[in-house]
Amino acid sequence: MAIQFVINLLVSVIWLLVTNSYTLNNFVLGFILGLFLVYLLHRVLPGQFYLVRIYRIIMLIITFLTELIKANFGVLKIILKPRIENKPGFFVYETELERDWQLVLLSNLITLTPGTVVLGISDDRKKIYIHSIDFSTKEEEIQNIKSSLEKVVRKVGEK
């Protein structure tokens, strides 16, 4: 991925030198030409096309921000109710992530989401212990995490 970006920048700089025009517009045009060239050569270059990984990271950020906003409103709803009706609880989330950095990223995203805290990870790195401030059902909580956060974390790690 890094070599593809370096080649793209190199093509941009060469474009600036060949055209003898050192403007931002010309650099952007050279960058787009370099992007096209790297895309044509990405089967020969190591790794996947680097814009795919950048797109997946952007989707991870958007998904996390969406979950963050939904969780904030959920916690706000709990706080503003005159009666305490939430049912906090602990549950075990079994993950299919294989790499340590993916597991840590998922755990951090869960903890950063209001209303949930990761308490620990099992020794076999297949289970995450989570506390939720409003525990409706285990299946619903697990499906929520699996369909949103774990899905995009897994995609970022794919090659």
Swiss-Prot record:
Single GO MF annotation: monoatomic cation transmembrane transporter activity
Pfam families, A to Z: MNHE
Annotated compartments: Cell membrane
Presence of keyword Transcription: no
A cellular component term, taken from the record's GO annotations: plasma membrane
Membrane-spanning residues: 1-21, 27-47, 60-80, 101-121
InterPro entries named among the record's database cross-references: Cation_antiport_E (IPR002758)
Record's keyword terms, sorted: Antiport, Cell membrane, Hydrogen ion transport, Ion transport, Membrane, Sodium, Sodium transport, Transmembrane, Transmembrane helix, Transport
Domain of life according to the entry: Bacteria
Membrane topology qualifier: Multi-pass membrane protein
Gene Ontology biological process: proton transmembrane transport; sodium ion transport
Primary location group: membrane
Similarity section: Belongs to the CPA3 antiporters (TC 2.A.63) subunit E family.
Oligomer status and interactors: May form a heterooligomeric complex that consists of seven subunits: mnhA1, mnhB1, mnhC1, mnhD1, mnhE1, mnhF1 and mnhG1.
Function: Mnh complex is a Na(+)/H(+) antiporter involved in Na(+) excretion.
Protein name stated in the entry: Na(+)/H(+) antiporter subunit E1
Organism: Staphylococcus epidermidis (strain ATCC 35984 / DSM 28319 / BCRC 17069 / CCUG 31568 / BM 3577 / RP62A)
Taxonomy of the source species: Bacteria, Bacillati, Bacillota, Bacilli, Bacillales
Chain's gene name: mnhE1
